[in-house]
């Protein structure tokens, strides 16, 4: 840390799941990681993940790809200007790049009215909306509750289908449905 002229370091002891100690030194020469680099990397292209998302690069500068399907919850938080929108766009772009419209639908809520507007161009393919809605991207906070209630109804109907089919996961159900068993 002294030879790098680092103002501060963080020690992670032990690194979870490993018998090692980590020393995190801030990088004062950060590199821009382009989305194209991530989406064309072998780690992303060749992945067998159900819902692959390209997050960024590891400390060893390797592309990092995670499976959104394996995450029970995902919270993105931070101060203004810290990259939350960039991260969200990376997740959305990853899924759009890897999935066909028949396999993926988004319900987008954008109370700021400007964060997700660029996705209005894919409305007919990737965005789900209520039958009586004019816009696929919800910007009116009053309509959010109604949309979430509709999603809960859809979720309950899907759970009923899983129960009838004797499946616990959507992947099991899809495999059963595709093979017509």
Please provide the spans of the model-predicted regions:
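Short, charged/polar, Gly/Pro-enriched secondary-structure boundary elements
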Residues: 28-34
């Amino acid at each position: 840390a002294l030879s790098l002229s680092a103002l501060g370091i963080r020690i992670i002891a032990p690194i979870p799941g490993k018998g090692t100690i980590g020393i995190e030194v801030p990088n004062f020469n950060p590199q821009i990681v382009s989305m194209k680099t991530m989406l064309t990397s072998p780690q992303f292209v060749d992945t067998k993940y159900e819902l692959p998302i390209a997050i960024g690069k590891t400390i060893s500068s390797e592309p990092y790809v995670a499976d959104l399907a394996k995450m029970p919850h995902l919270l993105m938080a931070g101060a203004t200007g810290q990259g939350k929108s960039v991260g969200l766009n990376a997740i959305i772009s990853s899924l759009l790049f890897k999935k066909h419209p028949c396999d993926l639908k988004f319900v987008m809520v954008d109370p700021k009215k400007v964060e997700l507007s660029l996705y209005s161009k894919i409305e007919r393919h990737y965005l789900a909306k209520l039958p009586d809605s004019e816009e696929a991207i919800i910007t009116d906070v009053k309509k959010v509750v109604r949309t979430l209630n509709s999603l809960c109804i859809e979720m309950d109907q899907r759970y009923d289908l899983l129960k009838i089919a004797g499946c616990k996961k959507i992947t099991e159900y899809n495999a059963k449905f595709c093979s017509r068993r």
